[in-house]
């Protein structure tokens, strides 16, 4: 069960990552949930150091909240927040809409989805009339069973527009290139497809893989519906985990639609000899391993489907998703699982009511009709919440036999079994093992009391294993309700093993499956105060019995650690022992590889969480104030700063030498941090320092994750190389595009030139210009202009000389006029005469230059007039 809808803002969203990465999923918070999906992809990839965010897309999966869960006389879990859990019914792979509504297109159109006529993105499909108009996948006939839904998210839509507050929400980061399976009735091919490109692009590859002569008459189907090849997987919202059916109408050997058996509307099977997933006729019924390969979504319109509880080999109850056809009963870990966890052929089993420990609890027992001597007989138990739920499932092929039908007198033994089961301690919910005012189960109290009094100084207590036979004997005594005196036991390791076994066999761990992701996310926080505060909040939110047992147990383990000098069990040793027994993730029986990956990724964090619960007990389980974390940094360089006394106190620089240890009080986002050194406070560049490890849990997590660090480094190097190659390919493609664009531009210019040359108007103008170049008068224009400028300069010089002479004469005349009595001697007369002669020469010369200038101007004017006449033509 997921957290309430508002909790994603507190704990963040569960982000799933593609296979092959460093982790399967991670809890991640966003500062703003109003960002677009594309921006969310950018943030996710940046935080994980992933390259090429444009190559990823997001897919949201979630479960519908059950309308009610009947317990005793009341309804629990009704959904009061319908807005946050609104089903995405307009999408393939989501829940079924009303029969009158179209699927995938958002209501009325058939361009992007499945229409009522039975096509995906098309408007006709006369061949597949056996399918119903609405029952495609995830049809819930039980009102209590949640439906798993999925949808490809639009990059341009806002993140908050999707039901982030729904149950079990997972935002899957998926690559745009997806692996799909295509089946033609004979063979299955794995193909890579870009979910954003039209599926018509895929048909060439299909033709090559299946060696088709032509794809013009080939069609693809999924969910029994024909796919519109002009659209893409993302727009059609197709679940790529399901196979595509390839059919060629012109090929007589092609998969015929008659071979697609809807099995009276109860199930989806292909062919009589096995098809998708290998499900075949009764002849193949014994091939259980082959039959388990049936994807949950490939079973269309089952008789019944929904969540029930099934007992596993360890006698603990697991919630599984069941699908019942007219012959088989399948159970899956989730409605979207690609492989069944198990399968029963109903006609081969005796089905009868099993004894129950609760008055309103009903269980069915499935016993094989044909047993082989010496072989292990597997009896299946399925639990229902009440008789009403059982009646909903009591439909063919499930026929409940009476006690006499199986030849055993259950009436004589049921009471004894009930009494025995009622006293069972191991493998039952922890709240059922306490009585009265005592919140701690007796087995926990007695084992801890024994160890405190007899085994606190035993070397390797809890680390070394006790006798398995002895542990099983004590377990049997507790389960039978016998009086137990552990102090008779001489092997303290057996008693310690008994306590670990009890914790390990709890059907729901002490820290609960529900809060697994929240605890992992809390322990992953680096800041000590924030981490402890969130862990404390989560611990206090546990059920009362869980909290009481956890507090009692962690206080005891802390006492064991104080005897480490004798027992050699330090805190980190004990955290490694108890961590996996306190918290674990649900295991997928059909996905062993994924379980191992999760175990490798989360084990260091689980051990660190147990370490926090033991070492920081006083902060988590008491009211002791959580101290603020001191963040220390070592200076890499000397920082002289600016300490001239003119800056304000807030902007004052912090001066320090190289190698100094600085207390960081604030880490600014602008690259400037605030800190304290030798009693002085101030700012300094963040690039000048290196943070020092400040948390023992951080050191432990770093040490435990050494292998992951190497793997991450290798993966980053591979991703970097891949990115460089992609960038090179991208540049080559861009250069090719640029080359083609330049060639196209050159061709356009040449065509334009040819068109201009052939234009009559342009031709006439070109001829006119050619004739103008041969005209002598026009050819003389530049020369005449040069002559004109030359004459003008000469005229200007003579004019200036004339003005100077004029000024001189005026001055001399005024001098002479002012002194008429002065006599001129011969020499002075000659000088005046000489000046006069020079002046006359200059004036004559100027007159000639002026005349030539006027003539040149006239010539130029005439030439310009002639040129104007030519161009006016």
Swiss-Prot record:
Record-linked CDD domains: RhoGAP
Bias kind Gly residues: ranges: 103-112
Domain PH stretches: 301-402
InterPro entries, A to Z: PH-like_dom_sf, PH_domain, Rho-GAP, Rho_GTPase_activation_prot, RhoGAP_dom, SH3-like_dom_sf, SH3_domain
Alphabetized GO MF terms: GTPase activator activity
GO CC annotation: cytoplasm; plasma membrane
Subcellular location: Cytoplasm
Region of interest called Disordered, as start-end residue ranges on this chain: 64-147
Record site feature (Arginine finger), residues: 463
Compositionally biased region (Low complexity): 66-91, 113-144
Record domain SH3: where: 628-694
Keyword Coiled coil: yes
Keywords, comma-separated and alphabetical: Coiled coil, Cytoplasm, GTPase activation, SH3 domain
Domain Rho-GAP: 428-621
Pfam families reported in the protein's UniProt record: PH, RhoGAP, SH3_9
Residues forming coiled coils: 715-761
Biological process per Gene Ontology, one example term: cellular component assembly
Function noted in UniProt: Rho GTPase-activating protein involved in the signal transduction pathway.
PANTHER family, alphabetized: RHO GTPASE ACTIVATING PROTEIN AT 16F, ISOFORM E-RELATED, RHO/RAC/CDC GTPASE-ACTIVATING PROTEIN
Record's protein name: Rho GTPase-activating protein gacJJ
Organism encoding this protein: Dictyostelium discoideum (Social amoeba)
